[in-house]
UniProtKB/Swiss-Prot annotation:
Gene3D superfamilies: GroEL, GroEL-like equatorial domain, TCP-1-like chaperonin intermediate domain. Keywords: ATP-binding, Chaperone, Cytoplasm, Nucleotide-binding. GO terms for cellular component: chaperonin-containing T-complex. Transmembrane segments: none annotated. This is Putative T-complex protein 1 subunit theta-like 1. GO terms for biological process: protein folding. The keyword Cytoplasm applies. Possible molecular chaperone; assists the folding of proteins upon ATP hydrolysis. Residues 1-33, 528-557 are annotated as: Disordered. It is found in: Cytoplasm. It comes from Homo sapiens. InterPro entries: Chaperone_TCP-1, Cpn60/GroEL/TCP-1, GroEL-like_apical_dom_sf, GROEL-like_equatorial_sf, TCP-1-like_intermed_sf.
Length: 557
């Protein structure tokens, strides 16, 4: 991202260079004026190849030793071990963006890097840090004020949201992208309330091995890939559900305590007391009307026999996320012990559903406006299912944003190029520090379409030049596609206004903080005195202090 056009502040600095100073050779690289720039560049270099619909994937080896093939910036950032505080700060901002909106993680990282690189150039040309910070804040405010004027499309309350989710799903580079997008869009649209509100937790995701992603489907109700235990396999009417985050059996089956038993009678009494306690707990569940128990821990065989006796279906959940979804949809608490809940979950039926080679447990409601739908994902490999699951969750979170603000802006880098044109026009007319800062901000924004073109394998300079010419002519709908520039309105590539605005705010917060940091001070514990072991003595002796004293500023210390 080298700057080719000197700004208003660059010319006096270049003319005032000392002729005795020769330029440095490439081997003698100048130190960064921004101490955080190198760390941010390193982090951005990891994320850059994954940006956009044509981004590449990476083999990610987690701390547990698992190898994951993913192009999701959020997953990559989460797995990285970072030490630099600037990298920590940037990752936190990017992850917050992903958690709040489901999109824009790579956008935050790459734009932060571009703005910091431009900021260092301005610092080299003599712009003071306080003025740089103030000018960047002014440019950010100008961007946020201009952004709503680019919203030329809106998602209607009865409109199919598939095209609005296309941009989010496209970043995961899944082969049956259109099929999954339509499934998620239909599920979100069906769950949406009449008043326009949308609860993401009412759309479940269930992964089953076998088949292909094209075999994925929607199921009425909430489906989990849990395991049915015992002889009771279904409740066909009036299911009352209890959820337990504990083993279905003794509270501590492997307790380290040792029972003091002095006779066979004591042993019989001890076993009888344990059995009576378990039967009492299961009997209390049955007395409260509980006929379905979902547990997160292990299932004890003796307790399972008691559950069959009382007609209770026992389901062993495979993940914490599944049981949390059940808790939110059924509106019943997740209990730490085998006690009847004060408010059991209610649904019409609980049964096992066979889908190809996989089995799912379905919680179904009889009413037409079912409170939950499940996207059932099929696949041959764990990695493929995991990538598809991430894409679906991100799309569900992304759909939540248009429900708050339905305005959409052009995607595929068109918005960034339009904002760069606006800042360039204003920056060329402004005097003082705002002019060069606006121009620097514009150059940083153009870096995002450049990255899209680079990841698509296009001639970057030609594509950016063509885009700039079209935008200068007033056509703000031209973005980067697979074979060149495209009309985003015709291709249906849109970004959500609220998500893009949140991304700009996150970037501004990080950049405005890092441009004022000049060095990193690490607090460490004072070193302990080393000890010398004397083999001739049984005692250890401390190393004697040095005899000579240093002088600092001409004074003995």
């Amino acid at each position: 991202m080298d700057s080719t056009v000197p700004s208003a502040l660059e010319l006096p600095q270049r003319l005032a260079l000392n002729p005795r100073e020769s330029p440095r050779s490439p081997e003698e690289e100048e130190p960064h004026l921004l101490s955080s720039l190198a760390a941010v560049q390193t982090l951005a270099n990891v994320i850059r190849p994954c940006y956009g619909p044509h981004g590449r994937q990476k083999f990610l080896v987690t701390m547990k030793g698992e190898t994951v093939c993913t192009g999701c910036a959020t997953a990559i950032l989460r797995a990285l071990e970072l030490e630099h505080p600037a990298a920590w700060l940037l990752r936190e901002a990017a992850q917050t963006q992903a958690e709040n909106s489901g999109d824009g993680t790579a956008f935050v990282v790459l734009l932060t890097e571009a703005l910091l690189e431009q900021a260092e150039q301005l610092l080299k040309f003599g712009l003071p840090r306080p003025q740089l910070r103030e000018a960047y804040a002014t440019a950010t405010a100008e961007v946020l004020a201009t952004l709503p004027s680019l919203a030329i499309q809106s998602l209607g309350p009865l409109e199919d949201p598939s095209w609005a989710l296309h941009s989010v799903m496209n970043t995961h580079t899944l082969p049956p992208m259109n099929h999954l997008t339509k499934l998620v869009a239909h599920a979100c649209w069906a769950i949406k309330e009449l008043d326009g509100s949308f609860k993401p937790e009412r759309v479940g995701v269930c992964t089953l091995h076998g088949g292909t992603l094209e075999d994925s489907c929607l199921l009425q109700g909430l489906a989990i890939s849990g395991k049915l235990c015992g002889q009771m396999a279904a409740v066909l009417s009036g299911a009352r559900v209890a959820l337990f985050a504990c083993p279905f059996g003794p509270a501590h089956p492997n307790a380290p305590a040792t029972a003091c038993l002095s006779s066979p009678a004591d042993l019989a009494q001890f076993s009888k007391g344990s059995d009576q306690l378990l039967e009492k707990q299961v009997g209390q569940l049955a007395a409260a009307g509980i006929n379905v128990a979902v547990v997160l821990g292990e299932v004890d065989e003796e307790t399972l026999t008691l559950a069959d006796k009382y007609g209770i279906v026992v389901i062993q959940a495979r993940s914490r996320m599944e049981i949390i979804y059940l808790s939110e949809v059924l509106d019943t608490p997740l209990l730490p012990r085998l006690l009847p809940p004060q408010r059991p979950g209610k649904c019409q039926r609980v049964y096992r559903q066979e889908l190809g080679d996989g089995l799912a447990v379905v919680f179904e409601w009889e009413c037409t406006g079912t409170p939950a739908l499940t996207v059932v994902l099929r696949g041959a490999t764990t990695q493929g299912l995991r990538s598809a699951e991430q894409a679906v969750y991100h799309s569900i979170d992304a759909y939540f944003q248009p429900c708050q603000d339905p305005r959409l802006i052009p995607g595929a880098g068109a918005t960034e190029m339009a904002l760069a044109k606006m800042l360039s026009d204003k920056g060329s007319r402004l005097e003082g520090p705002n002019g060069p800062a606006f121009l620097a901000f514009a150059r940083a924004l153009k870096y995002l379409p450049k990255t899209l073109a680079e990841n698509a394998g296009l001639a970057v300079s030609d594509v950016v030049a063509e885009m700039s010419g079209v935008h200068q002519g007033g056509n703000l709908l031209m973005g980067v596609g697979a074979e060149g520039i495209i009309n985003v309105a015709q291709e249906g590539v849109w970004d959500t206004l609220i998500v893009k605005a949140q991304g700009f705010r996150a970037v501004a917060e990080v950049v405005l903080q890092l441009v004022t940091v000049d060095e990193i001070v690490v607090a460490k514990k004072s070193p302990t005195h080393q000890q010398i072991w004397n083999p001739d003595s049984k005692k250890t002796k401390k190393r004697p202090p040095p005899v000579e004293k240093k002088k600092i500023l001409g004074m003995n210390n």
